[in-house]
């Protein structure tokens, strides 16, 4: 039974109130209101709140993170927490309530410590029983004792046994931006703490600086009622420990999905490649075979690594994202993104490294997926780019943004091939996501080009050599109403030689800013979980001959392209273009074109073809497409 207490016993330091317009809170609200949460998370929390009580669980015992959840839930119309266990929120209470808390606190000083604690726990349990949401703090790790967390979970278990509604504990990731953690400790980190275990001062400074990049991600909730039924034969102490560990683990999974693993520097990754045992053996064997000094072969390997390796820097990514946001708004009419597909990518990224394999239509592809992943709170991949894109300044910018460069052809150069293969293997070993274009170059016609399976074979070989336990190959469709290279593509299809990419071309292409290129479409295919896929083959890859392995790589390449085709869409522009091209005379009336387009649409519908989301308003979509043609 939950104890009843007198009037003063309802004022505690952790209390939060449904008043956010008092003067002390308003300046903080300027920064707090910048914190974002995706609409799909808001919808899922609203649905969850109709089924039972929501308890928000965060890792650090942080007043700031408690305030972020407090303001965000108020702004989004979600269940507002009325209590933050273990955090002193008295400064953020309205003045009358703060004065009452101070008086109650003064009176409690004359009580025995144990009685005061029991009163506080009874208040918290009463709050839970009244179906009022609260915030609990889990601590940094399940292996580090947290009496506050154990008290909160114990109280939740007690209340769950007394009420007729389920309690949902929602683990919440609160992050102030997308910066990856570095393995090397800087002086700043030594003084103020790493991003994860930071002190109060650095947390506040970091939040103020990056508040416009801060976000909240609720992880998969735990239904406490179901959890207790599943673990009814275990000791409560064990249940509390394991439940706390599970909640912390779910927050860590979300963090990994967004930020990725701790990142080593370019030099450290290169050192790992050169010190790899199979790499060292290759260098020794190749030196003997080619009758060269081992030092010479190792020097060549290091030189190739410098040519290949990415040099990821957060600052460049942050600047680049701002430029790309402006570019998309200037050149395109919006991005149509497969949010369900992106959720699949997020779920995969929590469990294993993943390899994004998109079709290739435009140089914009290099930038687009990284931008979409950033905005979708998914860790950005390291992108395999051709050396044709390594010209200054774009090559420098791409390399700093996570691109690594490879030659179009390196047949006969065994050292280069081994270095590239081992670099990819080390990236996978570090749990870093990759991206490469299976067609090799850009398709000039919009149709899929025959797959090139060189990089795919290197990635599968890295898995086979145990550099990673598993990985997912994720096919991605990227479609454009118009590509910015349309003029050069027409020239090439008419017989003109391909012009090599250079700085002058970038300057000349500035006139694209005067045009609109319609929408961009991104759809995610079904991920191929490579371990399961390879185990399902009649013959295991270890038992295959070289020819059989190459045949398998080709098969996987074609299956990836088939999956990309499955999720490709008919766009309004492509439908209108087909209608215009089907007409054999020079001019066509609007009514006649409309009849043709309706006929095409009905035919494609009967064939179960996927249409772009913009077809939800078909007449407007076709009108917009016609406007692009008459620019």
Each predicted region: which residue ranges?
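Membrane-interfacial terminal anchoring regions of lipid-handling membrane enzymes
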Residues: 1-631
